[in-house]
């Protein structure tokens, strides 16, 4: 979503499926986002996101357009243009963690299944991926800790080649301060490298929010 991107790509704090367990109202929450990606380099790459939450379930649609590309033959002659894209459909669910048959109120567990469709013009691939998340609510009375493993599953081959999933271990924390400030940090550990995002949000009487963040890989 736009907010998580501005705050340094804080996906766990906003989309950890375990957070669905904390949704106690019966309302349907709908969010829309449009984000331009690498806007200082290209002007046609970005994604649209739609999210729906109700009770302990969430539904999402992500469409990523990678921008216009040139299609060439073996001699390098341009034969046309195309726009590769990815579509991701997701369903998430959250619940309390059980320990020895008893519910642990401060810990939630969640799962999200995703159907992924890549369209690379001459080649297409699809697959099924799974995210698993844990949420520890207000550790020591103030720290919200999120843990997750993301993008584990199966993708079909493209032209006989295996497709690597961006599987990762995700660790994040969120510290609310006096109902005005929120501090975010998240680390994403991939095979051979990692990324990190941090952000801060200021809430003015629940009427106006100022968000800032930084992301590096």
Model-derived segments and spans:
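Subset of outer-membrane beta-barrel
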Residues: 1-217
């Amino acid at each position: 979503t736009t907010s998580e991107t501005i705050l340094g790509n804080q996906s766990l704090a906003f989309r950890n499926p375990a957070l669905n367990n904390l949704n106690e109202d019966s309302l349907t929450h709908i969010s829309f986002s449009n984000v331009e990606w690498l806007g200082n380099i290209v002007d046609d790459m970005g994604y649209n996101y739609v999210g729906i939450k109700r009770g302990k379930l969430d539904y999402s649609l992500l469409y990523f357009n990678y921008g216009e590309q040139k299609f060439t033959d073996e001699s390098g002659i341009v034969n046309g243009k195309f726009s590769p894209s990815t579509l991701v459909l997701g369903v998430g669910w959250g619940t309390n963690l059980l320990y020895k048959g008893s519910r642990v109120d401060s810990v939630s567990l969640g799962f999200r299944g995703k159907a992924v469709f890549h369209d690379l013009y001459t080649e297409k691939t699809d697959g099924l991926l799974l995210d698993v998340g844990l949420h520890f609510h207000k550790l020591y009375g103030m720290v919200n800790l999120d843990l997750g493993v993301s993008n584990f599953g199966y993708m079909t081959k493209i032209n006989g080649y295996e497709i690597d999933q961006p599987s990762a271990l995700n660790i994040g924390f969120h510290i609310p301060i006096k109902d005005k400030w929120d501090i975010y940090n998240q680390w994403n550990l991939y095979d051979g490298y990692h990324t990190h995002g941090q952000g801060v949000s200021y809430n003015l009487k629940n009427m106006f929010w100022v968000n800032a963040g930084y992301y590096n890989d």
